[in-house]
């Protein structure tokens, strides 16, 4: 059982206030929890209590936050949350994956609603990365408008047999990062994967 009495209040509060509310619903306590993996990776023991790490990539940390919200410009609803946000001389956005990369998931088809399809950021990302959506499939409303865009991994030059990476979440996070940073800011978006040595 995870002992929160030895964990600093700011870490506990981040998960209590996060959209997943993973402490109260018990998800955090699973050995397969990405959130728990994030805390284990970005905290250190000081005076018998877990605190946020103070250095990252050789630099002192100005700010670190778990469950960091990334509001996307012109998108309503609950914003996507990055597992960890770190501010040094650059901004680092970290998405943590534990068991997800070993799951046979349903991510092979990427469905995006009209609020994403019509968002200028989404269009810029498609153009910048030369993602060809000419052979895309759409779900149409009664007036013939595309209300849900369906993309596949092939649009991103990812092998169809690869079904364990959530490209929809990746696109939403990327849009959130672009919405919350300026072009001249130094930033990076990284993934932290759990490597099970028993799995090829």
Enumerate the language-model features and the residues they cover:
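Short, solvent-exposed loop/turn segments at secondary-structure junctions
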Residues: 69-75, 98-101, 195-198
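Extracellular structured ligand-interaction cores
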Residues: 34-38, 79-83, 91-93, 165-167
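Long, compositionally biased interface segments
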Residues: 185-200
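Acidic, metal/cofactor-coordinating or nucleic-acid-engaging core segments within structured domains
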Residues: 105-188
